[in-house]
Amino acid sequence: MKLKTKTMEWSGDSLKLLDQRKLPFIEEYVECKTHEEVAHAIKEMIVRGAPAIGVTAAFGYVLGLRDYKTGSLTDWMKQVKETLARTRPTAVNLFWALNRMEKVFFENVDRENLFEILENEALKMAYEDIEVNKAIGKNGAQLIKDGSTILTHCNAGALATVDYGTALGVIRAAMESGKRIRVFADETRPYLQGARLTAWELMKDGIEVYVITDNMAGWLMKKGLIDAVVVGADRIALNGDTANKIGTYSLAVLAKRNNIPFYVAAPVSTIDPTIKSGEEIPIEERRPEEVTHCGGNRIAPEGVKVLNPAFDVTENTLITAIITEKGVIRPPFEENIKKILGV
C-alpha cells in the first residue's frame, strides 16, 4: 500500500517528507530510507506538527524493522523506538504513535509477514489522521460565525498533519460550509511557521490571509479586528492545560483580556492522561542559532546569551474550548476530558 499527501509520501520502502524548512520558496522532498534518517528529519524539523510527527515516527518504526540485521529482534526494535522517541520531547503524539506500533509488533513478532503488518498499521494511522482532522474541522466550524476574522499561531494545518489540519481544518471546514472567513497568521518567531507555512498553505487554498508580526496581536484585538483565536496543540494535560508553540500563552492572555474566544483544536491522541497539569509537561529547548539567525543571517550580536523554549503552556482558565474529533470539550475540563477519554 502507498500514501501520498502534500506532507509525506510512503512508497513501501522509503518515506519522502516535504522539507518544511525551505518553504515557501522551495518545494523539495527529503527521502528517508532508514529509521535514523526519519529521526533526523523529525529532530531537524524537516517535518513538524504533533500529528505529522507521530505518523512519521510510525513509518520510521517500520523502516527500523527493515534495518534489522542480527541479534535480538526485540532488543533492536526497542532501540529503534528509543531513537525515534528522543527526537522531540514535548509532542505527545510521537510517543502515542510509537507505543501503538510497539504493541502491534509484540502481538505479531513471530509472524512471517511482520513488516507488512507494521506497514499496514502505520498506513491505518495516517488515514485515520485525515479523517480525525476532518471531524475536528466539522465540530469546530460550528463555533465560527460567518464573516469572522480568525487569528492563528504557528502552523496547525495540512503541513502539521498528514492532511487537512487541526486549527486550519476548522477554518477549512467553515469555508466549505459557505462561511466567509478571513485569517490573520502571526509570523511565529523564531521559526516563522506562520509567515512561511500557514500563509503559504492558505494562499494555495485561496483563503484570504494576512501575515502579522507577533507583537501586533494585542492591538488588533483591542481594535476589534479579531473575532476568535484558533490554535493547535502539542500536548494537552488531563486538566486541559495546553502546550503549544511558544507565544500561544501570550495570545491566550490577550484574548482573555479582550473577551475573545480562544479555541484549541487537537485530536484526542494529543491529550496525555498521565499528565495532570501543564506543570508536568516537558518543554523542549532548541538551539540558540534559531533566535540569533534569520534566513541564515546573524541578527544578534556574537556571544549574546539566548533562551529558546520551543513551547509554552496555556492554563485551562484561558481556554474557551478544546475542539476534538469526538466533540467540543468545555469547562470543567478535567471532568469532561475524562468523559471523552472514558477514564
UniProtKB/Swiss-Prot annotation:
Q: Which key words are in the record? A: Amino-acid biosynthesis, Isomerase, Methionine biosynthesis
UniProt site positions, description: Transition state stabilizer: C154
Catalytic site: D234 (proton donor)
Name used for this protein in its record: Methylthioribose-1-phosphate isomerase
Query: SUPFAM superfamilies, alphabetically?
Result: NagB/RpiA/CoA transferase-like
Task: Output one GO MF annotation.
Answer: S-methyl-5-thioribose-1-phosphate isomerase activity
The UniProt entry, under Gene3D superfamilies, shows: translation initiation factor eif-2b, domain 1 (1.20.120.420), Translation initiation factor eif-2b, domain 2 (3.40.50.10470)
- The UniProt annotation places substrate binding at R48, G49, A50, R88, Q193, N244, K245
- Give the reaction(s) catalysed: 5-(methylsulfanyl)-alpha-D-ribose 1-phosphate = 5-(methylsulfanyl)-D-ribulose 1-phosphate
Q: What is its EC number?
A: 5.3.1.23
Q: What is the purpose of this protein? A: Catalyzes the interconversion of methylthioribose-1-phosphate (MTR-1-P) into methylthioribulose-1-phosphate (MTRu-1-P).
Q: Tell me one GO biological process term.
A: L-methionine salvage from methylthioadenosine
What Pfam families does the annotation carry? IF-2B
Protein source organism: Thermotoga petrophila (strain ATCC BAA-488 / DSM 13995 / JCM 10881 / RKU-1)
Give the InterPro entries listed for this entry: IF-2B-related, IF-M1Pi, IF_2B-like_C, Initiation_fac_2B_a/b/d, M1Pi_N, NagB/RpiA_transferase-like
Family listed:
Belongs to the eIF-2B alpha/beta/delta subunits family. MtnA subfamily.
* Biological or metabolic pathway of the protein: Amino-acid biosynthesis; L-methionine biosynthesis via salvage pathway; L-methionine from S-methyl-5-thio-alpha-D-ribose 1-phosphate: step 1/6
